UniProtKB/Swiss-Prot annotation:
Keyword line: Cell projection, Cilium biogenesis/degradation, Coiled coil, Cytoplasm, Cytoskeleton, Phosphoprotein
Record's subcellular location: Cytoplasm, Cytoskeleton, Microtubule organizing center, Centrosome, Centriolar satellite; Cytoplasm, Cytoskeleton, Cilium basal body
Lineage: Eukaryota, Metazoa, Chordata, Craniata, Vertebrata
Coiled-coil residue windows: 70-97, 139-178, 206-288, 323-457, 539-604
BP-aspect Gene Ontology terms: cytoplasmic microtubule organization; DNA damage response; non-motile cilium assembly
Assembly and oligomerization: Interacts with PCM1, CEP290 and PCNT.
PANTHER family (UniProt xref): COILED-COIL DOMAIN-CONTAINING PROTEIN 13
Name of the protein in question: Coiled-coil domain-containing protein 13
Domain of life from the UniProt record: Eukaryota
Protein task: Required for primary cilia formation and promotes the localization of the ciliopathy protein BBS4 to both centriolar satellites and cilia.
Low complexity bias: start-end ranges: 293-302
Protein source organism: Mus musculus (Mouse)
Main localization of the protein described in the UniProt heading: cytoplasm
Length: 709
């Protein structure tokens, strides 16, 4: 129905557009006609003026006639325009009504198709379904009747409008055929036309109100006419139905005046039909009677007549019984067929109901799956968007890190260049300082030699003044170098040590070596760089770096120890695991051997044969347990002990060992199950944490999107 409405709307719009185009064309044609008429009138006026002047010698009469002619022309033009506008309106209304008729016909066809489809769909339905179908059919028939009535009224209105159009066209033709000037016979009509023209020219609110009322009354009249036409059509239909029911040439007033009976016309028709059948049967029986019955005796004529009446009654009764029997048989067969059809329909209905249930359940499951898939797709889309955002962020971070790495590399290259330049400078400075130190040491040696010489001279001069002996003078002369030699040697050693410290620790300690006094001279050198703030700052930084380095070394040692301890623990646990696996294998092999031995002990008939077999037996287990020599030795010893024991004790021992092995196996299974359960719990917790993290992540993303929006 939505498609029909949309198509109807499009058709209406197209129809409106066509009407507008036609209206514009008509306006253009009317304007052209007006221009032509005005030009023709102007020419005719000029000719009449030229022609009237010589006939009528008075100019006033000619002017009055011209004015009257002009006024009449104007009135006629107004009437023509009014008639043309009415004609145009009626044409437009006629087109609209034709369009509405087409739409109604289309709706009627659509409804008929729908009714047929409903009939085909609900054929064979019984019970409530049949009632629903009947009610629906009744409603549709009512709607169809209403639409048919509307279509009939529209057709009647179209006929009226076509008649009106024809009348208006006729009036228009008559008005155009009228002469422009009239004689003295139309002298009485001229004042009326002038009055109508004056009224038309005057546009007052009262006139407008009256025109509106006139239009409303015209609309009401058209509606009433349509209703009257529809009522007339219904009356005609009713009369046709009565004529078909009662018969033609029957006075309805007499039927209304005559008292009615309880029997209707249909019942009377049935009674008459039954009487006709009876009469036909009687006629057939009379024709089939033998000719000998006519030659019967006269005295028995009354009895034969009586018998014929009885026979007639009997025949009639028998025929009625036959008819009843046939009708009963027909009804029974119809009932059977209807019952079979009803059973089939019930089966079909049950099948369809079960099918509908199955399909509804499938539809529900599919809808739930669709909803879950839609939710999953939405979550996946959100996750993909989040991952894409994260990927973009990581790409941005990677690009920034690459830029930082490039900048760090460039800065590292600059630092390396600076360090190399500083190292070259420091090496050149160290070489210069070494040269200076060597020069100063040479100067110091020269000064020491000069001081020694001066001291010797001083001692000589002092000895000469006091009158000392040359031996005494020699003694101190010899003594002074001896006494001074250790000092000079010590000073030399100190200088060597200072030079070594300079060479080993760089130019920072050269200054301290230079400021340190090399010998006990009377004028000592003052320290210049021993207490400088720069040196103190470098020393403090060096101490801090040293402390940090020591702490890092201690931490590294601790971590190494921790790693070694962990490695030891891992190795111990792995060794324990291997040992446990080896023991488990040994115990399994031992249990297998014990079971085999027990079976053989049960099968052996005597103790001697058992001992012989056990003596010959130890070969295969040793071959089976080649990888574990200790296990094979234990098994051999246990087997020899079992061989020495009696049968009952051997069986008890084997049962005890088997029970122990079963307990150990159960314990190992329990341990394995607990380990598996622990792993499963860990895996479950891992999945739960992942789900929680995913949920939190999605919630945060949704909040972020909501905040952005």
């Amino acid at each position: 129905m939505a498609a029909d409405e949309s198509s109807a709307d499009t058709l209406r719009l197209q129809f409106k557009a066509m009407q507008e185009l036609q209206h514009r064309r008509l306006q253009k044609q009317m304007e052209k006609k007006r221009e032509k008429e005005l030009s023709c009138q102007s020419k005719a006026d000029n000719q009449e003026g030229f022609m009237v002047i010589p006939d009528g010698l008075s100019l006033l009469d000619t002017e009055e006639q011209n004015l009257k002619n002009i006024f009449e022309k104007r009135v006629l033009e107004d009437e023509i325009q009014h008639l043309r506008s009415e004609l145009r309106e009626t044409v437009d209304e006629n087109g609209r009504l034709y369009k509405l008729l087409k739409e109604r016909d289309f709706e009627i066809k659509h409804l008929k198709k729908k009714i047929e489809e409903d009939r085909f769909a609900f054929t064979g339905a019984s019970g409530m379904a049949g009632d629903l179908v009947a009610t629906k059919i009744v409603e549709l028939s009512k709607k169809n009747r209403g639409l048919m009535a509307e279509s009939e009224s529209a057709k009647v209105r179209i006929k009226q409008l076509t008649n009106r159009i024809q009348e208006l066209e006729h009036q228009l033709q008559m008005a155009s055929a009228k002469p422009p000037s009239k004689g003295a016979t139309d002298a009485g009509a001229k004042p009326l036309k002038t009055q109508t023209g004056d009224r038309a020219l005057l546009e007052t609110p009262e006139v407008k109100a009256l025109q509106d009322r006139l239009a409303a009354t015209n609309l009401k009249m058209s509606d009433l006419r349509n209703q009257i036409q529809s009522a007339k059509q219904e009356l005609r239909v009713a009369q046709k139905v009565l004529a078909n029911e009662v018969g033609e040439d029957v006075n309805i007033q007499q039927l209304l005046a005559s008292p009615g009976t309880w029997r209707g016309r249909a019942q009377q028709i049935l009674v008459l039909q039954s009487r006709v059948r009876d009469l036909e049967k009687q006629l057939g029986q009379r024709q089939n009677k033998p000719a000998g019955s006519s030659s019967s005796e006269v005295p028995l004529s009354s009895d034969s007549r009586k018998m014929t009446a009885q026979e007639k009654n009997l025949l009639r009764i028998r025929s009625l019984e036959r008819d009843k029997q046939e009708s009963w048989e027909k009804l029974a067969s119809e009932r059977d067929t209807l019952q079979t059809e009803l059973e089939e329909l019930r089966k079909k209905f049950e099948g369809m109901r079960s099918r509908n249930k199955v399909l509804s359940s499938e539809v529900k499951t599919l809808r739930s799956q669709m909803t879950t898939l839609v939710e999953k797709g939405r979550h996946d889309d959100e996750l993909i968007d989040a991952l894409m955002d994260q990927l973009k962020q990581l790409q941005d971070i990677l690009s920034s890190l690459s830029v930082q790495e490039e900048s760090r590399r460039t800065s590292q290259q600059h630092l390396d260049q600076k360090v190399n330049s500083e190292a070259q400078r420091s090496s050149s400075l160290v070489a210069q300082l070494r040269a200076m130190v060597a020069d100063r040491e040479a100067k110091v040696r020269q000064l020491e030699l000069e001081i020694g010489q001066l001291s010797v001279q001083y001692l000589h001069g002092k000895g000469g003044g006091e009158g000392a002996s040359p031996a005494d003078a020699r003694f101190p002369e010899d003594q002074t170098p001896i006494t001074n030699s250790p000092a000079s040697a010590g000073d030399h050693v100190g200088r060597l040590g200072s030079s070594r410290s300079v060479t080993s620790l760089g130019h920072t300690l050269v200054e301290s070596a230079l400021t340190r006094p090399s010998l006990p001279s009377p004028h000592g050198t003052s320290p210049r760089f021993s207490d400088s703030p720069e040196q103190k700052g470098w020393q403090a930084q060096a101490a801090e770096m040293k402390a940090l380095w020591q702490a890092a070394e201690v931490e590294r040692d601790r971590l190494n120890e921790f790693v070694t301890v962990l490695q030891k623990r891992v190795e111990e646990s792995s060794s324990k695991l291997l040992e446990a696996e080896r023991r488990l294998q040994e115990e399994r092999q031992r249990a297998v051997l014990l079971e085999q031995h027990l079976e053989k002990m049960r099968l052996e008939p005597s103790r001697a044969s058992v001992s012989q077999k056990t003596k010959n037996k130890p070969g295969p287990p040793a071959a089976n347990t080649k990888p574990n020599s200790a296990g094979s030795a234990k098994k051999d010893s246990s087997s020899t002990q079992l061989c020495d024991m009696p049968m009952e004790s051997q069986i008890q021992e084997l049962n005890a060992r088997l029970a122990i092995q079963m307990e150990e196996n159960g314990i190992l299974r329990d341990a394995l199950g607990s380990a598996l359960r622990g792993k499963e719990e860990d895996f479950r917790m891992y999945h739960q944490t992942l789900g929680q993290v995913k949920g939190v992540f999605l919630q945060a993303l949704r909040q972020q999107k909501a905040n952005k929006q």
